[in-house]
UniProtKB/Swiss-Prot annotation:
Gene from which this protein is expressed: ilvM
Keywords carried by this UniProt record: Amino-acid biosynthesis, Branched-chain amino acid biosynthesis, Magnesium, Thiamine pyrophosphate, Transferase
Enzyme class: transferase
Cofactor(s) needed: Mg(2+); thiamine diphosphate
A single Gene Ontology CC term: acetolactate synthase complex
Note: E.coli contains genes for 3 AHAS isozymes: ilvBN, ilvGM and ilvIH.
Coiled-coil ranges from the UniProt annotation: none
GO biological process: amino acid biosynthetic process; branched-chain amino acid biosynthetic process; isoleucine biosynthetic process; L-valine biosynthetic process
Organism of origin: Escherichia coli (strain K12)
Ranges for domain ACT: 5-78
Keyword Secreted: no
Protein name (Swiss-Prot/TrEMBL): Acetolactate synthase isozyme 2 small subunit
Record's cofactor remark: Binds 1 Mg(2+) ion per subunit.
Pfam families: ACT_5
Length: 87
């Protein structure tokens, strides 16, 4: 499974985070970690997500860019993760 670090800049509305997380889930990605902080102007937020999926991150990138409140999406890093099964 691939892990991707995604940075999203968006307008600060109560429903914005919900919409971003719904798109991530509907596109088949799992949230491994998340950090959200208000931008310096207090009207925008910066969301840092680490997501995992065998799917291409390009689909998630294009779908997040279509959201009304999203101003910018950047894919910063991709890494491969291995899953261990213990008996």
């Amino acid at each position: 499974m691939m892990q991707h670090q995604v940075n999203v800049s968006a307008r600060f509305n109560p429903e914005t985070l919900e919409r971003v997380l719904r798109v991530v889930r509907h596109r088949g990605f799992h949230v491994c970690s998340m950090n959200m902080a208000a931008a310096s102007d207090a009207q925008n937020i910066n969301i840092e997500l680490t997501v995992a999926s065998p799917r291409s991150v390009d689909l998630l990138f294009s779908q997040l860019n279509k959201l009304v409140d999203v101003a910018h999406v950047a894919i910063c890093q991709s890494t491969t993760t291995s899953q261990q099964i213990r008996a």
